[in-house]
Amino acid sequence: MVVEETIKATSTEDLSNTIANQNPRGRGGDEDEELEEGEIVGDDDLDSSNLSAAIVHQPHPLEHSWTFWFDNPSAKSKQATWGASIRPIYTFSTVEEFWSVYNNIHHPSKLALRADLYCFKHKIEPKWEDPVCANGGKWTVNFSRGKSDNGWLYTLLAMIGEQFDCGDEICGAVVNVRSGQDKISIWTKNASNEAAQASIGKQWKEFLDYNDSIGFIFHEDAKKFDRHAKNKYSV
């Protein structure tokens, strides 16, 4: 289990303090502007030797390992099958590795339109077809275009810091960059477990200090009805 003082947050204020205390480069800011639009990370930035040099001698292990995935918008049109262009970026298992990776990838406001950035538990692919995700669903929060950076970071911290009471139900999260808005979704395992899904949705809103209603859609419905799928739960 992660060391308690490393990532411990029950409110937006606590998460903000976590950012200030643990992020070796503060809040991220403009340091990543040198990357080209739509690019996730330079070839050298995530070299294992560079990451190792940035990690302190006494790392703080997370309860689960997590993998960042990226779906490049420029590659989507070249793929006939949905999800074929999604590729893993890096798997991390400590707090220090998380910040090393997070500080070397574009945040949502810097990503190109139609880009998708995922963070899922290791060995779970961010696809409906993955056996762990197949019977699940997702909660979604909408943000104005370019305004989801903090929401994305707070979501990541809550997930990897095991802040959800029903955290075992969580597969991962994704931020979708679209024209006019950004969407952040949390994917879960068992959509029919209404109590667990409601718990996750309510706690997520608390972590984000988000007051509007949010909805939960079954993956099975999303596959059948696409954008016309209706919410099964709301909080």
UniProtKB/Swiss-Prot annotation:
MRNA binds at residues 78-83, 110, 128-129, 178-183, 223-227. Keywords: Cytoplasm, Disulfide bond, Host-virus interaction, Initiation factor, Nucleus, Plant defense, Protein biosynthesis, RNA-binding, Translation regulation. Residues 8-24 have a biased composition (Polar residues). Coiled coil: none annotated. According to the redox status, the Cys-133-Cys-171 disulfide bridge may have a role in regulating protein function by affecting its ability to bind capped mRNA. Gene3D superfamilies: RNA Cap, Translation Initiation Factor Eif4e. Disulfide bonds join C133-C171. GO terms for biological process: defense response to virus; regulation of translation; translational initiation. One of its GO terms (molecular function) is RNA 7-methylguanosine cap binding. Pfam families: IF4E. Residues 60-63, 70-106, 154-163 are annotated as: EIF4G-binding. Component of the protein complex eIF4F, which is involved in the recognition of the mRNA cap, ATP-dependent unwinding of 5'-terminal secondary structure and recruitment of mRNA to the ribosome. Recognizes and binds the 7-methylguanosine-containing mRNA cap during an early step in the initiation of protein synthesis and facilitates ribosome binding by inducing the unwinding of the mRNAs secondary structures. Key component of recessive resistance to potyviruses. (Microbial infection) Susceptibility host factor required for viral infection by recruiting viral RNAs to the host ribosomal complex via an interaction with viral genome-linked protein (VPg). EIF4F is a multi-subunit complex, the composition of which varies with external and internal environmental conditions. It is composed of at least EIF4A, EIF4E and EIF4G. EIF4E is also known to interact with other partners. In higher plants two isoforms of EIF4F have been identified, named isoform EIF4F and isoform EIF(iso)4F. Isoform EIF4F has subunits p220 and p26, whereas isoform EIF(iso)4F has subunits p82 and p28. Displayed sequence is cv. New Hampshire Midget and confers susceptibility to zucchini yellow mosaic virus (ZYMV). Belongs to the eukaryotic initiation factor 4E family. PANTHER family: EUKARYOTIC TRANSLATION INITIATION FACTOR 4E RELATED (PTHR11960), EUKARYOTIC TRANSLATION INITIATION FACTOR 4E1-RELATED (PTHR11960:SF8). This is Eukaryotic translation initiation factor 4E-1. It comes from Citrullus lanatus. The gene is eIF4E.
